[in-house]
C-alpha cells in the first residue's frame, strides 16, 4: 500500500538533513498521529514509476559524462597529441559510451511501458533500474579520470555528477531490481518486443522485408 501525507498537516514534521547531493532536495518526515490517505495496492505501481523516473535521471548523467569525457579527451593534449589517442583513454570513453547506450535503451523501453502498467511495466522498470544507476556511477567516475586533476576541483561539475550518481545507486538499488526481475522471469513474464512506429515507417519496413528476402 501507499500512504499519502499532507506535509502541512498537524502531526507532520519535515526536516532537511544534509545530503551527499546538494543539487537535490531531501527530507526526513516524522509522523505523530497524522492523518494519511491510503492507496491500497499502490506500492508496486509507485515503485515501478519511481524506477522509471530515477533511471531516466541516471541515464541523463551517464550521457552528459560520456559526452564531456569524449570532448575533453579530444581537446586535451599531452606529449604533443590529444589524450584521446592513448589506448587507456580510448577504453574509458568506449566503456562509458557502451554503458550509456545500453541503459538508455532500457529506460526508453521502461518509459513506453509506463502507459501499459502491470507486469510489463514492472519488467521494463526493473531492467532499467538494474542498468541505469550503475551506468551513471561508472560514467561519472571514468569521466573524472579522463578529465584528470581539473575534475577534482570545486569549480568543475564532475563532482556534482559523482554525487548524484552515488545517491541514485542507493535510491534505485540495482540488486533489488535484479531480484525483482528474476522473480518476474520465474513467473513466466517476458517483455513484449514490438515497437510502435509512425505510419510513414511502413514504407521503410517494406524495403527491409524485400531486402531480407533477397539475402536469404
Regions found by a protein language model. Name each.
Residues 54-57, 88-91, 95-98, 127-134, ...:
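DHp/HisKA dimerization-phosphoacceptor four-helix bundle of two-component histidine kinases
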Residues 55-84, 91-92, 96-100, 104:
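Oxyanion-binding "anion nests"
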Residues 37-47, 73-87, 145, 149, ...:
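Conserved catalytic-core motifs characterized by acidic clusters
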Residues 70, 78-81, 97-131, 145-147, ...:
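C-terminal helix-coil-helix/basic helical segment that borders enzyme active sites and/or dimer interfaces
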